[in-house]
Amino acid sequence: MLNTQRAQEIAASPIMANVTYQEVPIYIQHVDEQNETARIYPLDNPELEQDVPLSQLMEH
């Protein structure tokens, strides 16, 4: 599970972090602190953007 601060660090970093959503590698585009969600997309499908709870993201 990612906390808000770590998710923001990952989103701002130029270095790709190993983060998954439902076991799928994803890229974090934006973090919404108020709602504790992140806008993400799967690395293999950039068109599939979605907002998901930070609690469902895993850093490996």
From Swiss-Prot:
Keywords: Sporulation. It comes from the Bacteria. One of its GO terms (cellular component) is endospore-forming forespore. This is Small, acid-soluble spore protein H. Belongs to the SspH family. It is found in: Spore core. Induction: Expressed only in the forespore compartment of sporulating cells. InterPro entries: SASP_SspH. NCBIfam families: PRK03174.1 (NF002867), SASP_H (TIGR02861). Its main location: other. It comes from Halalkalibacterium halodurans (strain ATCC BAA-125 / DSM 18197 / FERM 7344 / JCM 9153 / C-125) (Bacillus halodurans). It holds the Pfam family SspH. Disulfide bonds: none annotated. GO terms for biological process: asexual sporulation; sporulation resulting in formation of a cellular spore.
